[in-house]
């Protein structure tokens, strides 16, 4: 079984200004790493799952979804340069994101 982690799935320069943009940029990272074929589908599925809530605490958010957009389970990691990506209004902005895709 291949690892769900890869250095190709890590970025320290996420420029997103909101959660939709953050998820989209991370989905594009997954596709660029060869772990998926459809960034749009990944984004759609993660946003649909986000409607039920995304875990977030102390500046770390964990958007996740089951999606047909990936060819193998993957975890993408990103650090936001804007530090203003909000998944949970009560928790404030997230600076670090772990996007789990299966």
Predicted regions and their residues:
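Cytosolic covalent-transfer regions centered on His/Cys nucleophiles
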Residues: 1-102
């Amino acid at each position: 079984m291949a690892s769900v982690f890869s250095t190709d799935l890590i970025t320290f320069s996420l420029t997103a200004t909101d959660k939709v943009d953050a998820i989209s940029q991370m989905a594009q990272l997954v596709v660029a790493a060869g772990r998926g074929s459809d960034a749009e589908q990944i984004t759609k599925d993660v946003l649909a799952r986000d409607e039920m809530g995304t875990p977030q605490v102390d500046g770390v958010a964990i958007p996740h979804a089951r999606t047909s957009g990936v060819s193998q389970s993957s975890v993408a990691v990103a650090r936001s340069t804007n530090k203003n990506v909000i998944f949970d209004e009560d928790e404030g902005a997230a600076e670090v994101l772990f996007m789990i895709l299966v």
